[in-house]
């Protein structure tokens, strides 16, 4: 989130309730005296909760060391590294206790059908994680199918425990995968022409042309960068149950992308369960067919001033 203040943590600092209200305060000038008027709409719409504010000037990094999109690629790389480190710690703990846990479960009755179904499930999950570059490769070969004739009780017990451990080792990647999957789908499905986004455990994310050439992040159009920055911040940085404020998402954005914007935001909200999303926009294309959920600040504030 492109804010004025940044903590040492990669997660950017959110604005508080009072700062947001002050940012959108309404000014009325009479003679040479300036007065600030609070908006009843903003007071009612923005609860005293944690706020995430995505400003209009969002492409440039505050520290001017890297562009915002380059910082985001590094941020995703750090998330992947953290998940890998957590997975490694889980692996070490489970591997060291495997013999003892195996003896404890030796008398459990496990069917070959159950084993086979779980093997297929974990195989699919690994393939998805590898597809997005979250994990590199399968480090252990697991047979895909077993039959009642070839799978004895002792093998069932070992495999069942192994599968349970394998799933737990992959668990640190679960939430990250859901976010990456949505991020990639939103970009590849709706806005990227002649290129696609790639996820990497070496680069975070990068873009590749249809002919396989890597595209520098700085060579993306301003519209593409604006959209990517918004999606990334909402998916990977904004916190659950927070109130989201987005200022002028239409900046540099193609009209077709503007019409898709609210649908994309709805998908992100479903994943991250935001409390509320408020968007300040001048674009009827952003609103699209959703005028029933809009509030005209100019019109309503003029009415309030006339009534004073």
Model-derived features: positions:
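Charged, surface-exposed helical/loop "interaction arms" that form contiguous linear patches used
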Residues: 133-184
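Sequence-level detector for tyrosine residue identity
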Residues: 15, 23-24, 155, 162, ...
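P-loop NTPase switch/coupling surface
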Residues: 1-147, 192-203, 300-308
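Short, well-ordered helical secondary-structure segments
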Residues: 16, 34, 41, 47, ...
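Exposed alpha-helical structural elements
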Residues: 75, 89, 101, 158-161, ...
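Switch/communication elements of ASCE P-loop NTPase nucleotide-binding domains
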Residues: 1, 174-308
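Alpha-helical protein-protein interaction elements
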Residues: 90, 121-124, 154, 165, ...
């Amino acid at each position: 989130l492109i804010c004025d203040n940044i903590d040492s943590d990669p997660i950017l600092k959110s604005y508080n309730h009072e700062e947001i209200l002050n940012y959108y305060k309404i000014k009325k000038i009479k003679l040479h005296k300036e007065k600030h008027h609070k908006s009843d709409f903003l007071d009612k719409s923005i609860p005293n909760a944690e706020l995430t504010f995505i400003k209009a000037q969002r492409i440039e990094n505050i520290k001017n060391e890297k562009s915002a999109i380059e910082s985001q690629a590094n941020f995703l790389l750090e998330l992947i590294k953290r998940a890998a480190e957590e997975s490694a710690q889980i692996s070490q703990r489970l591997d060291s206790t495997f013999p003892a846990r195996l003896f404890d479960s030796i008398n459990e009755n496990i069917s070959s059908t159950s084993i086979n179904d779980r093997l297929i499930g974990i195989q699919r999950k690994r393939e998805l994680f590898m597809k997005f570059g979250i994990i590199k490769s399968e480090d252990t070969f697991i047979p895909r199918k077993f039959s009642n004739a070839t799978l004895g009780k002792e093998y069932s017990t070992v495999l069942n425990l192994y599968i349970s451990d394998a799933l737990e080792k992959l668990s640190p990647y679960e939430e990250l995968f859901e976010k990456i999957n949505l991020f990639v789908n939103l970009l590849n499905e709706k806005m990227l022409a002649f290129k696609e986004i790639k996820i990497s455990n070496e680069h975070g994310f990068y873009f590749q042309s249809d002919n396989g050439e890597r595209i520098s992040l700085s060579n993306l159009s301003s519209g593409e960068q604006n959209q990517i920055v918004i999606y990334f911040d909402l998916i990977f940085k904004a916190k659950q149950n927070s109130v989201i404020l987005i200022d002028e998402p239409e900046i540099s954005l193609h009209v077709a992308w503007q019409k898709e914007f609210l649908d994309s935001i709805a998908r992100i909200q479903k994943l991250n369960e935001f409390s509320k999303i408020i968007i300040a926009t001048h674009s009827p294309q952003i609103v699209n067919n959703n005028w029933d959920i809009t509030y005209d600040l100019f019109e309503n504030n003029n009415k309030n001033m006339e009534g004073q």
